[in-house]
Each structure stands twice: as structure tokens, then as C-alpha cells.
Amino acid sequence: MAMRKLLSKKLFNITNVASQSLMNCRISSSSLAVRTRVPNDSTDTTKIAPEPGDLAMSRRFMHNSAMIRPAEIMQMPVGESLIEKLREIDGSKDRIRLDGLSPPERETSLTVADTKKLLRAAQIEIVKSKLRETGRSWMPYKEFVSVCGEASSDPDLGSKIAKMLDDSANVIVLGDSVCIRPDQVTKSIEGLLPLPKIHNPNDPRRIEFKELEAEKAVIDVKAHTLVRKELWAGLGYLILQTAGFMRLTFWELSWDVMEPICFYVTSVYFMAGYAFFLRTSKEPSFEGFYQSRFEAKQRKLMNEYEFDLERYNELKKLFCSKPSDHVSKILGAIKS
């Protein structure tokens, strides 16, 4: 019995201590604990005794916070390290950069006026190509208008296209005739233009031209004489060759022996004429051979006499210019 009373007393004391500790615990959130721990009168400090270790925990917390804060402040990046830190963050990657976006391309469309210009230019080029295909220099105006009408979808536009070609100087309309190649007209008119200096008999260039012309005449005579000597020498060589073949054929040998010899000699002459044509681009005839040898002798003599051929040609073009064959056509068209 005594043992039971002792055990029950011990258990009762343990229960009281446990309930008291629960009531006094700071982490308890029950209403009973709040009512018990929080006094009604703030001046009464005798009801609740502070738990052992509360002051120590507070001091420890304040000490730790005081020790941590300076360390955290010292670890903050400053200066270049801050710039590197910002570069590592690189917040611009997630941003939308509008400055790099190009505006949408505008669609280029032809206006009605531009389309008309292109069609007109195409029609004019077609007309010019057709006129070149004819190979003619002059054409009646009616035929010219009909050609212009064939180039367009509407035949009535032929007169308008003809007028545009005339205004742009692609053709020259003279009365009822049309000159398809104005460049020939220009060259012909250049020969008809009066030049006052040319008609001056005391012009020093005219005197120079006469001297060069006289010197060239002497060179031409000498070249002609040399070429004539070569031609006579060639004729003598052919006569001797023919006489030699006749003697070999009828006196020394027979025709059976001379026939292949004459064939091969003729083949050699043919090959020589073919080579002459390849070199000079002239027909292998007596006249072609004469012209080729005359030009060769003339160049050789000009080099010996130091004759200025370029100056002579320039002065000859200036003082001895002759109108071309198209002048008569132009004058006839103008008169008509």
C-alpha cells in the first residue's frame, strides 16, 4: 500500500510538471497558453518567471546577426566585379530588341504611267529591229508607217510611233522618204560642210600636204618599178621552166617519166597560191600578187625615206575629202 501511494504521488507530480511546461512554452499557440502567459497588468512581473535560457538565446541571436551582417556586406560585388556580375546576369537576352527589327519591305508596284512608258519603249525597239532586218537605208513614208503599225497591237498607232522615232532622231523623215540609218547621213553631210581654212591657199598644212604628196608619188613610182621587175623576172622563170620541161620530155626523157614530175610541180604551185591567200587574204591571181608586192615595196621604201604616213592620211582626209555615195540620195530626196 505504501508502495502504491508513493508511485501515485510520483506520477501526479510528473503530470503537473508536464502540464506546467506545456503551458509555459513560448511556441505554444493555444489560447490557454496565451491567457496564462500574457498578464492583464503589465506592471505585474511576478506571475510569470522567464524561462531559463531565454536571455541566452536572445543574446545568441543578436550576436549571430551582428556577426553575419558585416560579412554579407563585405561579400557584395563592387566596381569591376559588379560589372562582371551584371554581364553574367545579362538580362538583355530575355528582352525584345525592337531596334534590330527591320520594317517590312514595301511592295514596289508599277504605276499606269510607268507601264505605258515600258510598252512604248518595247514597241519602239520592235520597230527598230524590224527596220534593221530590211537591210535598207531608205524607205517610203507609207511603208514606214505600216511597219510601225505592225509592231503595235493597234495599227492606228503606226503614225504616232513613226512620229516618236522622228522626234528622237532614230530616223530622218525627208518629205515622202525616210532615212533608216541617220549615221550615213551624218557622215555624208560632214563632207559637204564648208571649212574656211581649207580653201585658204596659204595654209601651211596645205603646203605640207603637197610636199608629202610629192614625196609619196616618188615612192609609189619606185615601188611600181620594183614590182614590175619582179613580175618580169617571174615571167622569165616560167618561160625557162617550160622550155626545160619540153627538152626533158622530147629529147632527154620520155613523157612517162615527166608526167609525175609535172604533176608534183603543179601541186607545188597550187600550195604556194593557197599559202599566199592565207597570208594576205587576197585572191591568188596576178592582180592580187601585184597589189601584195606593191604594198610590201611601198612600206619598205617609206621606212627608208622616213615618210610620215599617218600625217599624210590626216591631211589627205582634211583637204581631199569626197562626199560618199549617199550624198546623191540625200540631195535627190530633198529635191523631191
Swiss-Prot record:
The chain crosses the membrane at residues 231-251, 257-277. The keyword Transferase does not apply. Its main location: mitochondrion. Pfam families: MCU (PF04678). It catalyses: Ca(2+)(in) = Ca(2+)(out). One of its GO terms (cellular component) is mitochondrial inner membrane. Residues 1-69 form a transit peptide. Ca(2+) binds at E259. It comes from the Eukaryota. A motif (Selectivity filter) lies at residues 255-263. Keywords: Calcium, Calcium channel, Calcium transport, Ion channel, Ion transport, Membrane, Metal-binding, Mitochondrion, Mitochondrion inner membrane, Transit peptide, Transmembrane, Transmembrane helix, Transport. It is found in: Mitochondrion inner membrane. The keyword Transmembrane helix applies. GO terms for biological process: mitochondrial calcium ion homeostasis. One of its GO terms (molecular function) is calcium channel activity. Belongs to the MCU (TC 1.A.77) family. Mitochondrial inner membrane calcium uniporter that mediates calcium uptake into mitochondria. Constitutes a pore-forming and calcium-conducting subunit. Mitochondrial calcium homeostasis plays key roles in cellular physiology and regulates cell bioenergetics, cytoplasmic calcium signals and activation of cell death pathways. This is Calcium uniporter protein 3, mitochondrial. The gene is MCU3.
